[in-house]
Amino acid sequence: MDTLHEHEAGNLYEEQRVDRVGDALTADAGDDADTLEDGQQQQQQQHQQLLGVNRQMAILLDAPQEPPMAVFPARGGLNGPPRLRKKRSFYTMVKPSPPCESQEPEMCLLLASVTRAMRQVREDQRGEYFANYLVENMTSQNYPNGVGLPQHWGEF
């Protein structure tokens, strides 16, 4: 076991000695800047080769990091720490009003009077009565310039 540690220590010393000899030969004072520059140049050359060979790869490599952080400020961007969004429940969004017998849907005056009059007619005659009532009462005398009538579907 001791021989293993001695062997590893010997290799470590050997690597340091090789670095010093290389530094002395290149006269770069041991900062290894030349090897870093060589590595960067080699990476740039490989990158340029990829760009020339495959346009799709070039587009992917040159694309900015996605998604941009400014799009999601809740993740800790400009507004600070992330906040959890409250999830909405379909059951609590709208509360139904209590059923009321006297409450009728909003409608124009003509339809309100038709429905009141139709309550007094037998069920089998209601369709005919409804049409006749509208023909008789939907006149320009009763509703001058269309005041009181709905202007479009769903208004009343």
Curated annotation (Swiss-Prot):
> Where does the source fall among the domains of life?
Eukaryota
This protein's UniProt keywords? Developmental protein, Differentiation, Glycoprotein, Spermatogenesis
Q: Which residues are glycosylated?
A: N137
Any GO BP annotation: sperm individualization
Task: Give the region (Disordered) as residue ranges.
Answer: 26-48
Is Glycoprotein among the key words of this record?
A: yes
Decide whether keyword Glycoprotein is in the record: yes
The record's listing under Pfam families reads: SOTI
Family membership = Belongs to the male-specific scotti family.
Say what the protein does. Post-meiotically transcribed gene that has a role in late spermiogenesis; required for actin cone progression during spermatid individualization.
- Any idea what this protein is called? Male-specific protein scotti
